[in-house]
Swiss-Prot record:
Belongs to the Mediator complex subunit 15 family. Keywords: Activator, Nucleus, Transcription, Transcription regulation. Residues 122-140, 174-189, 279-291, 333-343, 584-598 have a biased composition (Low complexity). This is Mediator of RNA polymerase II transcription subunit 15. GO terms for molecular function: RNA binding; transcription coregulator activity. Component of the Mediator complex. InterPro entries: KIX_dom_sf (IPR036529), Med15_C (IPR048386), Med15_N (IPR019087). Residues 101-140, 161-228, 249-311, 323-363, 575-602 are annotated as: Disordered. It comes from Caenorhabditis briggsae.
């Protein structure tokens, strides 16, 4: 191919340039959770790992998206952490090959995670349970946490290759890759683990007694994902997260030792997913073989790769991990006992006494440490069923956002969709946040029709979204998080309320008159739906940072997506001032802790200071608003908007007559987004799509004084579609960067000409190459980024 095509240095250099700003943002927004290495190291790692352009492009897209998610959700790594512990060891085969060859990964230290077995169906569920990330382990430290946070967003990579990867010698780890922290026991045959005898006394057992960090202290380098309840401080979850209880899995003292698929495993012969997986997972029969210091096993992953390989370890988990979140599958719950049982289940039912040398840790965090109890799993399942009705709306909105070029918003919606459809398992706390967010963004999601017809959908008619944020219809203070257990200190501290509490809560919510439930107040516009005072700050300042360039005001929670404004325009006739400052809602209502209900949801806007109500008024921003708006588009439109802006995020941005007429003349060939975004005080972004070619939209930055002033092309920093059409985008932007183009017509004509020329050239090759031969829907549906 040409020198600009993969794998040419020029092509790779372009990818590196695209990665650098994302890594920079990651380092800035999440300094405590850095993605190790610079852009070149990351790209080289991916390049060494991938054998085809298709595989390479998909992997880069995953990395970029993961980095972006990590940067935006560094404060919530617990929600995403689990996945980091589940990367299939041999995913090197990614899309290109159906099998992961250890030799292929040889250049990069193998990922110590034994998740290949875990990737198997039954194990997957168990692994996901292990991956449960509860806020209890706030000490997310080290790059691993970052990878976890990053990987979580991309972990669920249900594409066909993931299955192959998992089936592949995922457990195989190159010899010598044993985690340093892992005891030899971890490398012992998996079979012994089911009995608990497999782990040597010295090995970190699922109890986490051996070698586990002091209670409450995260395993070395692992940060403290609360994955395990067993090990030190309940770090056993790590082990679980690491992967199938298989070799060194949660059962094995060092899941990574096994995960690394030491020579020992390799010597055992071809990877036997079931043998490997079930041998160690037999203990799961009673409970997930959590290694009290499952975290430790993970630590090997870090420790082992903290060195130059540290980067690969994080990236490995980021790229390879199948999304394994806290088990929402009941299968995950150890039938033999409560996963959350204190002592971290020193001994699995099948392993009385636990692994030798792994004393039961009475101090282990008993609840929500990383594995959900059966009761919590029931709540999780019930919530999924209740929210299942939102899937179509989320899917529609995601598609709409993507069509409008707002890929970050679309991605976030797709992640939520994958959770609701059960393709991705998350912690109960994350699900609670998602439930409340969906309830509050009812209007944005166009879920109104379901509000009255689907009483089972707890979130849709939640008073939170209807403006009755302060109290329930019966006068009881409403818990913004959607269930009694999701309040105040309980948030992330105690287990979610039992199912019957949830049912009661739902009943209370349904008691509200239909009129109130369907009230036209747009939660999005009303300060994001009301203060989420009940819980701890879920995302720290970062959430605010992303949502508002003007830190003193957080009006227009969602001005960026044009679809939102479009959807909200019809709401402008609704009662009450809708475009008030986000904090006006917070200021007008008392937090759940105050017990003082407030009915002033539709009253006069109150411009509360961001720190009002003890600083908790910002919580809704941090907790929810950063789910959808992306920091790139969401911030720009708010720059010029004042507190009195209308609900759509401020006055509509209109082009002047000259620009509008010029675009109207081109409407036969181009579809122009009617709702323009403001790029800055003097420029407006116009998004155009070709009617005859399914290519990413072109974003033109038009001066408000057009035709005076220069039109430029805006290329978002994170444009996953640009990776799907990377070659095309490179050609297009190179062409549009040449001198000679000045008017909107010039740019659109040049764009169309270049795209048609590119398509014709590719037709001779049988169409676009594999990396771009699939549509966006296929890409996102399968990658679930």
């Amino acid at each position: 191919m040409s020198e600009e095509d993969w794998p040419s240095p020029k092509f790779r250099e372009h990818v590196i340039q695209r990665l650098e700003p994302e890594l920079a943002r990651n380092r800035q927004n999440a300094p405590n959770l850095p993605v190790p290495g610079d852009a070149r190291q990351v790209e080289e790692y991916v390049f060494a790992k991938c054998m085809s352009k298709d595989e390479y492009m998909r992997t880069i897209a995953k990395v970029i998206n993961a980095i972006n998610c990590n940067s935006k959700s560094a404060a919530v790594p617990s929600v995403l952490q689990p996945s980091q512990f589940h990367s299939p060891p041999c995913t090197t085969a990614v899309l290109g090959t159906g099998v992961g060859t250890p030799g292929y990964r040889a250049p990069v230290p193998p990922d110590p995670q034994p998740t290949s077995a875990q990737a198997r169906n039954p194990p997957v569920t168990t692994a996901t349970t292990q991956a449960s990330t509860t806020p209890s382990a706030p000490a997310v430290t080290g790059t691993v946490s970052a990878s976890a946070a990053v990987a979580a967003a991309v972990a669920s990579f249900p594409s066909p290759d993931s299955a192959a990867l998992r089936a592949a010698p995922g457990g195989q780890t190159t010899p010598g890759s044993q985690p340093s922290s892992g005891a030899p026991g971890s490398t012992t045959p998996n079979a012994p683990f089911p009995n608990g005898a497999g782990a040597q006394p010295g090995a970190p057992t699922m109890n986490g007694g051996a070698g586990g960090p002091p209670m409450g202290q995260p395993p070395p380098q692992m940060g403290a994902p609360n994955m395990g309840m067993n090990g030190p401080g309940g770090y056993g979850g790590y082990g679980m997260m690491n992967g199938p209880p298989g070799a060194g899995g949660p059962m094995g003292g060092n899941p990574y030792g096994q995960p690394m698929k030491k020579e020992m495993d390799q010597s055992r012969g071809p990877w036997d997913p079931q043998g490997h997986m079930y041998q160690q997972q037999q203990p799961w029969g009673g409970m997930p073989p959590q290694q009290g210091h499952g975290g430790y096993p993970n630590r090997p992953m870090n420790g082992q790769q903290t060195t130059p390989t540290g980067t690969s370890s994080v990236l490995e988990s980021l790229i390879n991990q199948p999304q394994q979140y806290p088990g929402h599958h009941n299968q995950m719950a150890p039938p033999g006992g409560d996963r959350n049982a204190a002592g971290g289940r020193a001994g699995v039912p099948g392993n009385p006494g636990g692994v030798p040398g792994a004393p039961q840790r009475p101090g282990a965090m008993p609840v929500n440490q990383g594995v959900m109890s059966i009761e919590d799993q029931n709540v999780y399942q019930m919530k999924l069923r209740n929210m299942r009705g939102s899937c179509d709306s989320l899917r529609t909105r995601a598609r709409q956002c993507r069509q409008e070029g707002n890929h970050e918003a679309a991605h976030k919606l797709e992640v939520m969709l994958s959770v609701l459809e059960g393709r991705r398992v998350v912690s109960l706390e994350y699900l609670n946040h998602l439930e409340t967010w969906i309830a509050r963004k009812q209007d944005f999601l166009n879920i109104n029709p379901m509000g009255g017809g689907n009483p089972g959908h707890m979130g849709m008619n939640d008073p939170v979204m209807n403006g009755d944020h302060g109290m329930m219809s019966n006068g009881q203070v409403h818990n913004p998080y959607g269930h009694p257990g999701y309040n105040h200190g309980q948030y992330g501290m105690g287990g979610p309320p039992p199912p019957h509490h949830m049912q009661m809560h739902q009943q209370q919510m349904w008691q509200q008159p239909q009129q109130q439930r369907m009230m036209p107040t747009d939660p999005m516009m009303m300060g994001g739906g009301g203060p989420m005072h009940g819980g701890p700050m879920y995302r720290g300042d970062m959430g605010h940072e992303m949502n508002s360039p003007v830190n003193s005001h957080r009006h227009n929670p969602y001005p960026s997506p044009a679809a939102m404004r479009n959807n909200m325009r019809g709401m402008q006739n609704g009662p009450g001032p809708i475009g008030r400052d986000r904090n006006s809602m917070s200021g007008s209502m008392s937090g759940p802790s105050s017990g003082a209900p407030s009915l002033n949801t539709m009253g006069t806007p109150k411009m509360g200071a961001p720190g009002s109500i003890g600083g908790l008024s910002n919580l809704d921003d941090f907790t929810y608003d950063d789910f959808l708006p992306n920091p790139i588009d969401a911030l720009q439109p708010t720059l010029h908007i004042g507190p009195g802006s209308s609900m759509g995020g401020g006055p509509r941005v209109n082009l002047n007559d000259a620009a509008r007429k010029e675009l109207q003349a081109m409407e036969g060939r181009f579809e122009i987004e009617p709702n323009h975004q403001r790029h800055d005080a003097n420029h407006i972004i116009v998004s155009a799509k070709m009617r005859n070619q399914p290519v990413p939209p072109l974003r033109l930055v038009v001066p408000i004084t057009y035709p005076s002033g220069n039109v430029t092309v805006d290329r978002t920093a994170i444009d996953l579609d640009a990776y799907l059409y990377d070659d095309l985008q490179n050609v297009v932007h190179e062409r549009l960067s040449r001198p000679g183009l000045s008017s909107l017509t010039d740019y659109l004509n040049a764009w169309e000409e270049q795209v048609n020329q590119y398509m014709q050239q590719n037709q001779t090759n049988g169409g676009m190459d594999a990396a771009f031969g699939v549509g966006n829907d296929f890409f996102y549906d399968n990658l679930n980024l």
